[in-house]
């Protein structure tokens, strides 16, 4: 699933080609995504100028003159630029054709993504209750410490809760916990303030590096320019169960936490 760095990589890749451009038309080949694409999306968006391309959590917000297109990539989705009129394959469901002769193409083999229209996107039910962005000053270890008091749930699903902080998915939660030396099974409420301060800094550091590297390519992800992400070359634990720890040489263990596979080092993470 594309996580925050992959979505931010996509945003940075497509924004220069979209901002300031007028939409010529919207071609929808398949409306049945996680939520149906509005039947009047072509009417609402055609003729409008795209004024901004922003991100909130894992949602891309294409701001037009009279509303905003909210897009989510789901489990396997991608947005990339093609020349208008480029033949579409089976899973290429939407083209937003621009006056420049380019088109923003949405591809989603599993159809778990979304394209929705909103006049007030930050008040939309999908966005209004989200926690702070991890790469802003609004997110810090103090917040993790305060929200975790009295919580018995494991720390990994705790930091993956979008009400706590947005955009920390399975890949980057695993890597941040390893970097901070914290066992992902440890109860969130038992972790000290000092360790949360360290964890927050590692979350910020790892997400920033992942964005710089263009995200992590696992199965389907490509950036807005069609290129893969390269952060997978720097993974310490995610997807490496049974392999040797790059730091201490111990065998990495794979467990299930919150219905997700989690890999950790029994020696480095306590």
UniProtKB/Swiss-Prot annotation:
NCBIfam families (UniProt xref): fpg, PRK01103.1
Stated name of the protein: Formamidopyrimidine-DNA glycosylase
Q: Name one GO molecular function term.
A: class I DNA-(apurinic or apyrimidinic site) endonuclease activity
Q: Which gene encodes it?
A: mutM
Transmembrane stretches in the record are: none
Enumerate the catalysed reactions.
Answer: Hydrolysis of DNA containing ring-opened 7-methylguanine residues, releasing 2,6-diamino-4-hydroxy-5-(N-methyl)formamidopyrimidine; 2'-deoxyribonucleotide-(2'-deoxyribose 5'-phosphate)-2'-deoxyribonucleotide-DNA = a 3'-end 2'-deoxyribonucleotide-(2,3-dehydro-2,3-deoxyribose 5'-phosphate)-DNA + a 5'-end 5'-phospho-2'-deoxyribonucleoside-DNA + H(+)
Q: What does this protein do?
A: Involved in base excision repair of DNA damaged by oxidation or by mutagenic agents. Acts as a DNA glycosylase that recognizes and removes damaged bases. Has a preference for oxidized purines, such as 7,8-dihydro-8-oxoguanine (8-oxoG). Has AP (apurinic/apyrimidinic) lyase activity and introduces nicks in the DNA strand. Cleaves the DNA backbone by beta-delta elimination to generate a single-strand break at the site of the removed base with both 3'- and 5'-phosphates.
Under the heading HAMAP family, the entry gives: Fapy_DNA_glycosyl
SUPFAM superfamilies recorded: Glucocorticoid receptor-like (DNA-binding domain), N-terminal domain of MutM-like DNA repair proteins, S13-like H2TH domain
Q: Tell me how this protein assembles.
A: Monomer.
- What UniProt keywords apply to this chain's record, in alphabetical order? DNA damage, DNA repair, DNA-binding, Glycosidase, Hydrolase, Lyase, Metal-binding, Multifunctional enzyme, Zinc, Zinc-finger
Family statement drawn from the similarity comment of this UniProt entry: Belongs to the FPG family.
The lineage's top-level taxon is: Bacteria
Report the cofactor remark: Binds 1 zinc ion per subunit.
Enzyme Commission designation: 3.2.2.23, 4.2.99.18
């Amino acid at each position: 699933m594309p996580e925050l760095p992959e979505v931010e990589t996509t945003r940075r890749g497509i924004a220069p080609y979209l901002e300031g451009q007028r939409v010529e038309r919207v071609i929808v080949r398949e409306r049945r995504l996680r939520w149906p694409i509005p039947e009047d999306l072509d009417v609402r968006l055609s003729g409008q100028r795209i004024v901004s391309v922003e991100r909130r959590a894992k949602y891309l917000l294409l701001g037009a003159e009279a509303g905003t297109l909210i897009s989510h990539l789901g489990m396997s989705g991608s947005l990339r630029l093609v020349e208008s009129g480029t033949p579409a394959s089976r899973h290429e469901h939407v083209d937003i054709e621009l006056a420049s002769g380019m088109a923003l193409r949405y591809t989603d083999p599993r159809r778990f993504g979304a394209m929705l229209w909103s006049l007030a996107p930050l008040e939309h039910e999908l966005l209004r209750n989200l926690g702070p962005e991890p790469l802003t000053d609004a997110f810090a270890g103090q917040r993790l410490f305060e929200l975790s008091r009295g919580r018995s749930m494991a720390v990994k699903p705790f930091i993956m809760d979008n009400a706590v902080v947005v955009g920390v998915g399975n890949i980057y939660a695993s890597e941040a916990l390893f970097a901070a030396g914290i066992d992902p099974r440890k109860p969130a409420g038992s972790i000290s303030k000092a360790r949360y301060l360290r964890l927050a800094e590692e979350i910020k550091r790892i997400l920033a590096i992942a964005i710089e590297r263009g995200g992590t390519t696992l199965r389907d992800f490509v950036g807005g320019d069609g290129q893969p992400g390269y952060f997978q070359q720097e993974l310490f634990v995610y997807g490496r169960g049974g392999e040797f720890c790059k730091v201490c040489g111990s065998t990495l263990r794979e467990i299930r936490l919150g219905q997700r596979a989690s890999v950790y080092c029994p020696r480095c993470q306590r």
